[in-house]
Amino acid sequence: MVHATFRNQLGTLAGATSADPAGFLDGLSPIHDAWHREGSRTYGFLLFHTRVVRYFTQIVAPGVQPQIQPFTAADFQNMGVGPFEYDLENVDALAELADFSTAIESWHNTAHMGIGSATGTPMMDPRQNIFFRPFWRLHRYIDDLFVQAMAQYGERAHPNQFVTASATASHIEAAHHGWVPRI
């Protein structure tokens, strides 16, 4: 479980900063940067970021006003960011989750550039971007799609078994190690 290093760092950080939103963001900065700089990916794009978004939502988001909402199609259009077009309806196998992860990561990279240009935030710097609302709006949008895909995969692969989409993600991390770098 090579991905466990990042997963454990995130879990330890979340536990240590559960009542310290600024501490969470400060601690996330080097972890996020290290994940981006990793030569050979050990923890997939969607699995890493869904955990990051989950901890952000628990620790930081409750104190943020106004609340951080996911970007909408109109928001993307207004910033000159092309829409993410992918048919999630047929995502019901690990290979399809991996394909979805690859597709949305590619789109996300372009979105980071466009959002950075439109908003003036350092979206291309993983040490800094986590301190800015546009980063979280983008990743909330992506995570909403991933949660939908995970729920669908979980229901089709293991009908009526998982309690939450995050439980499905944790199952993949625990039982399908070979897929973790790709999802």
Residue ranges and their predicted role:
Residues 1-183:
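C-terminal accessory segments of proteins
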